[in-house]
């Protein structure tokens, strides 16, 4: 029996055509925006390269110039030398070399974080520019045909006139059809291209200016106007800084609103009053240069309308919001001990367009923390500190950590944590908050909390520690915190284990995943998918992030369940405490799990940022799944 060949016919689906095209006026507006973006991104690439080359040149010639100056200084007669000694100049040169290494480390990834994204945005803009050129070409062709028709209508011969009109009309119909199709395609693709380019460009500008501020602060820490260094070398460096800033200022931000104040260098000798600080009339660069070395940064504050980069100046007078590179190579887990106010993931402001202002606050602000009801007796070690026995380890936005390198058995495997200048809470208040607020919350689970002790410190010790680290400390502190030196482990930030109370009722994505997508960061595991009653589901959620044995330890310990319950309990009654519990770090060692970063939050400086983040998440559609890929799973589907 012969076999029959059966062929399966597949029907091809016609692509869905857009029936409505945007008006010519709207297309012209889009074209104008695209051309401005194209000009801005090209300027960004040129100035970014200038920025990179200028800083490379600066950090390479600075040590040699300083060494030459020291050599000339030594040749001066003693009676003509300034107040500083040669030893002070050598120490200054060593600090400069350390800052130079940090600048070079930060510049290593410059092409990845600035130049490469610039080229990616340029690719988006290039596609739009090509479509604009195609449309302009069709419009000119259409106008040419229309002019030829006007000439043909004036011909005396009817037969010639009729044939030419017929030919031109067919051309007119063809060009009109092509122009309509192109107009529909522009209507479909232009808003997406413009929005994507704007968002990408805004984020790029944010990273570029943060890097610029970081470079400036690391180097300017060395040339800050000391009493004995009012000479030509710092002035020369300030001129170089000015040229770099002017090159960056030539970048046009176009329609992108990143809330960045203008960056200008003040004249030499400018002094800013507290009234100017409070009025918010100064930007990040001015505040950095004009800051008095002998005035505590806690006495001044920026306006709430200032940018994130500007507000970070008072929190971190030397480094930017990112921790500075440690001098000694140590595990990254130690950096968590120094991040006492806020993690980096919660500290970077998002770059958005114009956002409608919500009059009612999204959070209910509780009464500020007051140390009047704290315990009166402090736990003190009773040991004295010698700076030669402590080595700088790491620094964060609020604290600086030193490790013990001496021979006293009491301090073996210990670190001390010193407060940076400009912090709201003192070490004593942080300790009392930890003992009176945090410890009672974890009754029965105290083994997960790190044991801390108050250690008296002197002003001389703080000055020596400040010189050793190159970071300004609060010299009015009377105590520091002593704690165990955690080594050989991994860190994990569980973040929001419950949904934000400000999320819309019909939300699709949890707060943690929504914030990651809004900031363009990889989305990790969803905290809402952690099933504390089902081990297979719990392991499946953490698969790829931690090993199965660590997941089992987390599951059996119950610490994540406890954090979730506490976050839910205080999410509406005590926002500051709830945010502290959401910002904790889990340090997972070989034989223990420890909670870190449980310092109090300053509601006066943090509330506006938290509300701004919630507005951006809600009004940007991030809670509804914006930015999700086809393979991503909705967080709400995991809720029972």
Curated annotation (Swiss-Prot):
InterPro entries: AH/BAR_dom_sf, Ins_P5_2-kin, IP5_2-K_N_lobe. SUPFAM superfamilies: BAR/IMD domain-like. Residues 315-327 have a biased composition (Polar residues). Keywords: ATP-binding, Kinase, Nucleotide-binding, Nucleus, Phosphoprotein, Transferase. Residues 304-314 have a biased composition (Low complexity). It comes from the Eukaryota. Optimum pH is 6.7-7.5 (at 30 degrees Celsius). It catalyses: 1D-myo-inositol 1,3,4,5,6-pentakisphosphate + ATP = 1D-myo-inositol hexakisphosphate + ADP + H(+). GO terms for biological process: inositol phosphate biosynthetic process; phosphatidylinositol biosynthetic process. The modification Phosphothreonine is found at residue 372. A motif (EXKPK motif) lies at residues 491-495. Residues 304-337 are annotated as: Disordered. One of its GO terms (cellular component) is cytosol. It is found in: Nucleus. Transmembrane segments: none annotated. One of its GO terms (molecular function) is ATP binding. Has kinase activity and phosphorylates inositol-1,3,4,5,6-pentakisphosphate (Ins(1,3,4,5,6)P5) to produce 1,2,3,4,5,6-hexakisphosphate (InsP6), also known as phytate. This is Inositol-pentakisphosphate 2-kinase. The gene is ipk1.
């Amino acid at each position: 029996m012969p076999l029959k060949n059966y062929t399966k016919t597949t029907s091809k689906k016609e692509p869905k055509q857009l029936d409505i095209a945007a008006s010519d006026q709207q297309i012209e507006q889009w074209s104008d925006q695209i051309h401005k973006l194209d000009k801005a991104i090209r300027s960004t690439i040129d100035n970014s390269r200038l920025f990179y080359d200028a800083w490379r040149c600066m950090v390479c010639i600075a040590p040699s110039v300083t060494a030459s100056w020291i050599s000339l200084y030594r040749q001066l007669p003693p009676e003509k030398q300034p107040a500083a000694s040669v030893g002070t100049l050598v120490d200054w040169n060593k600090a400069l070399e350390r800052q130079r290494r940090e600048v070079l480390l930060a510049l290593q990834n410059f092409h990845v974080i600035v130049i490469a994204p610039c080229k990616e945005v340029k690719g988006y803009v290039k596609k739009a520019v090509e479509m604009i050129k195609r449309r302009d070409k069709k419009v000119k062709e259409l106008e040419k045909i229309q002019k030829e028709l006007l000439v043909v209508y004036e011909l005396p011969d009817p037969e010639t006139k009729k044939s030419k009109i017929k030919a031109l009309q067919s051309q007119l119909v063809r060009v009109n059809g092509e122009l309509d199709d192109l107009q529909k395609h522009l209507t479909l693709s232009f808003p997406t291209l413009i929005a994507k380019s704007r968002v990408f460009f805004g984020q790029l500008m944010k990273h570029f200016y943060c890097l610029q501020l970081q470079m400036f602060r690391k180097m300017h820490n060395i040339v800050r106007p000391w009493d004995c260094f009012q000479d030509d070398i710092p002035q020369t460096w300030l001129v170089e800084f000015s040229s770099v800033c002017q090159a960056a200022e030539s970048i046009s931000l176009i329609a992108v609103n990143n809330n960045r104040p203008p960056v200008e260098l003040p004249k030499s000798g400018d002094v800013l009053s507290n009234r100017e600080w409070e009025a918010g009339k100064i930007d990040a660069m001015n505040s950095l240069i004009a800051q008095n070395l002998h005035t505590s940064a806690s006495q001044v504050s920026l306006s709430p309308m200032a940018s994130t980069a500007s507000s970070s100046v008072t929190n971190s007078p030397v480094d930017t919001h990112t921790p500075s590179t440690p001098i000694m190579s140590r595990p990254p887990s130690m950096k968590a001990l120094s991040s006492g106010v806020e993690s980096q993931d919660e500290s970077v402001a998002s770059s958005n367009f114009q956002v409608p202002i919500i009059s009612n606050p999204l959070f209910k602000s509780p009464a500020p923390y007051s140390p009047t009801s704290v315990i009166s007796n402090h736990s003190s070690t009773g040991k004295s500190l010698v700076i030669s026995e402590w080595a700088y380890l790491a620094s964060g936005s609020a604290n600086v950590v030193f490790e013990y390198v001496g021979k006293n058995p009491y301090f073996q495997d210990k670190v001390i944590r010193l407060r940076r200048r400009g912090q709201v809470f003192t070490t004593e208040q942080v300790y009392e908050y930890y003992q009176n607020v945090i410890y009672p919350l974890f009754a029965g689970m105290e083994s997960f909390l790190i044991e801390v002790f108050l250690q008296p410190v002197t002003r001389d010790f703080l000055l020596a520690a400040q010189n050793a680290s190159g970071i300004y400390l609060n010299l009015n502190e009377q105590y520091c915190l002593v704690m165990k030196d955690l080594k050989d482990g991994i860190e994990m930030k569980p973040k929001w284990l419950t949904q934000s109370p400000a999320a819309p009722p019909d939300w699709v994505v949890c707060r943690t995943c929504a914030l990651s997508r809004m900031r363009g960061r990889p989305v990790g595991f969803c905290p809402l998918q952690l099933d504390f009653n089902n081990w297979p589901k719990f392991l499946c959620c953490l698969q790829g992030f931690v090993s199965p044995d660590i997941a089992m330890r987390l599951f059996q310990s119950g610490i994540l369940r406890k954090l979730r319950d506490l976050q839910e309990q205080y999410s509406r009654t005590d926002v500051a405490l709830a945010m502290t519990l959401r910002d904790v770090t889990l340090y997972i060692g070989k034989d223990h799990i420890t909670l870190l970063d449980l310092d109090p939050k300053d509601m006066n400086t943090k509330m506006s940022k938290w509300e701004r983040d919630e507005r951006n998440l809600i009004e940007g559609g991030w809670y509804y799944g914006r930015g999700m890929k086809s393979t991503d799973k909705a967080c709400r589907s995991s809720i029972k």
